[in-house]
Amino acid sequence: MVLGVAAAWFAITKSKVRAIWCYLCMVVCFFAIIMGSSDNAYLALAALFGFLPLILFKSKTGIRRYLLIIATFGTVIQCIDFINQAYADTVIGLDSLFEILTNFNGLIYVAAGLWVAYIAACLLSKYSRNWTGSVSPALVYGWAGFLLLSVLLAGFLLFHANVGGNAEKYGALEKYLVFNDSWGTNRGYIWRKSFELYRDFKPMHKLFGHGADTFGILTVSKLGAEMPERFENAHNEYLQYFITIGPMGLISYVAFLGSAVTRMWKSLETKPYIIGCCFAIICYITQAVVNISVPITSPVMWMLLSIGMAACNQRNID
């Protein structure tokens, strides 16, 4: 969420001092996410990098800022990889999806190319008259089409690897594409068991759930020693609510978050500062697919959501 706020505000702010501060916060967040060695953080990154262009590609300043953001991310990866190799006997080694990225031999050239593209965009904006005009809406629509194709491609890869039985063709990506009990640090196991437990619910529980915060009680009493490790939550916020407060509660929760994001998104044209709150929530609801609501993050999420909604309802700001 902090990354969503920092990156979004950096992307749209006109104040140089605020831009520098947000940029530094964003860099620290990039380092923290990668060094945390948690793959679920990459879902938030995908949401951030995927949806920001829908706002930024409406102006050439936004295009330059976006190029700077992704170039910085690539540079951060290279820096951490260098530290990993130079101090291999001192630091704790990193793995997960980060390892796949660093093993890509062309990563350094991609990062360098992004910096070249950013510098070229800056030079064009300063010296070229043709670069001072408005940006065609086709760029935003083109990016939206790219996002749609990316989703379809991801769906095809999942189908090809799981239903088609072609898991061995994907090499290091196999553990991300093939769903089994060990997927996602045994998330696959508890997700499968969650649906099996739901299948045995009484009709009333199938509508309204087993009871708030009773997932651990349910798994311990029903699964017991069968579990390879003790699961007191589903490691999926939406599945957790599906089991504990039922489809009715889950639909209400998703509808509330979705309507809040939609309301903030529609207000970005007139109140661009809301973008920080909006992207914080977008990043949160994306990573919630493999995480649950915890006391250290939930209050921050609800606070940012409340600030964003209050700003939408505020008519005049001096």
Residue ranges of model-derived segments:
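Short, charged juxtamembrane terminal tails flanking transmembrane helices
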Residues: 315-318
